């Protein structure tokens, strides 16, 4: 695949030209052959490191090309070698391109969404962290609402954070609309790294996603293809990844937000308005049940009834396993199930109340950049404490497969 990059009045445009047998077919399709990233009008292409443009392109089209990206600019040999380890050829290599020097940079950038996990990440990162929000432009009819996230960014700016809102339509490349890869929301941070003096990029990814807790079995993240594919290429581009919440469950991020001075700004629902979640989507159901179980918000029978009438919620609850099942087991083990449909007792029964989800899985410390690791560790422990050796073994022994095999799908009819 050919990648052409140009800039005009602070707007960086990526154009993609496919070769034979491209774009390859996946669960999603490549619906558009271009996208843009809109920075300040004074932004110049010379302020973007070539390796960062190439890394951004890789994050935009990774699912759909056949092992070769041919750029309209040269990249460093170091970056090209890192891509070769992913079995991807990136060309041309320009011997005059010096790798990005993150050692002299000062700040960590956070791919910020405004949700609970992202806000918890910001709560444990240094106060000099730069939150960067990818602002998806409105296109046609959509349930998506960014009002709450933009409100959060505005409030954080008032508190002294160096926040940036970057309009970017890379999600429109994909059909159905969404991020091509799970790290694509970091593209604005990557592209602004040189201009903003950023030495690394942080994501609000949580324990459930990183270690597959809540799915069928625990997986050691450093042994996954995700780690093997992405960790090195980010590091070799001079922007090592940090997962400050990688050892924290959704349970822990809610607890952090309930204690953090900025936690009240978090809103995970992307369909509601400011301070008014839609209370109809799956995320609202999961977060509401958890917050009630943690006594962060009071029980509300009327709200729960409304959530259980949602078609989306009912569909999700009928799955085996349910997405983030461990979080729901934690929540319902602390709620009066007599107040819920009768099938909940069997569906969410578990021999373990999963108390360890309230605390930090400290084995994840290696996924936090060494320059901020001690600070982040202290902040996490001050909010939720750390699991002991026995609890960490219980995390590593998570296996939900036999339990799922003997269960029947939950029916709410």
Q: What annotation goes with each model-predicted range?
A:
Residues 1-15, 56, 60, 64-68, ...:
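Nucleotide-activated chemistry modules centered on ATP-dependent adenylation/adenylyltransferase
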Residues 1-49:
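Short Lys/Arg-enriched alpha/beta "domain-start" segment
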Residues 30-65, 70-77:
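Extended, charged alpha/beta regions that create polyanion-binding interfaces
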Residues 113:
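Conserved adenosyl
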């Amino acid at each position: 695949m050919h990648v052409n990059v140009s800039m005009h009045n602070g707007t960086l445009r990526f154009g993609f030209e496919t070769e034979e047998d491209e774009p390859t077919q996946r669960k999603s399709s490549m619906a558009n052959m271009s996208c843009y990233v809109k920075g300040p009008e004074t932004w110049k292409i010379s302020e973007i490191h070539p390796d960062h443009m190439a890394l951004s392109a890789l994050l935009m089209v990774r699912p759909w090309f056949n092992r070769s990206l041919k750029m309209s600019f040269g990249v460093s040999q170091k970056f090209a070698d890192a891509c070769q380890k992913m079995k991807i050829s990136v060309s041309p290599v320009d011997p005059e391109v010096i790798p990005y020097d993150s050692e002299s940079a000062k700040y960590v950038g956070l791919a910020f969404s405004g949700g609970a996990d992202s806000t918890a990440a910001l709560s444990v990162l240094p106060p000099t962290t730069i939150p960067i929000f990818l602002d998806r432009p409105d296109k046609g009819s959509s349930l998506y609402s960014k009002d709450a996230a933009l409100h959060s960014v505005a409030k954080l700016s008032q508190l002294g954070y160096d926040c940036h809102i970057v309009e970017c339509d890379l999600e429109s490349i994909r059909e159905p609309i969404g991020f091509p890869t799970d790290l694509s929301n970091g593209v604005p941070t990557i592209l602004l790294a040189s201009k903003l003096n950023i030495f690394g990029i942080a994501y609000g990814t949580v324990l459930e996603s990183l270690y597959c807790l809540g799915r069928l079995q625990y997986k050691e993240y450093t042994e996954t293809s995700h780690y093997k594919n992405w960790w090195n290429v980010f590091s070799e581009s001079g922007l090592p990844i940090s997962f400050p919440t990688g050892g924290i469950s959704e349970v822990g991020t809610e607890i952090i937000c309930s204690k953090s001075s900025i936690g009240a700004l978090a809103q995970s629902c992307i369909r509601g308005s400011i301070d008014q979640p839609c209370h109809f989507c799956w995320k609202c159901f999961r977060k509401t049940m958890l917050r009630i179980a943690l006594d962060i918000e009071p029980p509300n029978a009327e709200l729960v009834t409304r959530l259980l009438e949602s078609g989306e919620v009912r569909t999700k609850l009928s799955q085996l396993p349910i997405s983030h099942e461990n979080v729901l087991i934690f929540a319902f083990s602390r709620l009066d199930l007599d107040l819920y449909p009768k099938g909940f007792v069997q569906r969410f029964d578990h021999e373990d109340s999963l108390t360890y989800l309230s605390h930090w899985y400290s084995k994840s410390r290696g996924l936090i950049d060494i320059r901020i690791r001690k600070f982040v560790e202290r902040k996490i422990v001050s909010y939720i404490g750390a699991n002991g050796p026995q609890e960490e073994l219980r995390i590593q022994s998570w296996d939900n497969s036999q339990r799922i095999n003997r269960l029947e799908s939950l029916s709410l009819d």
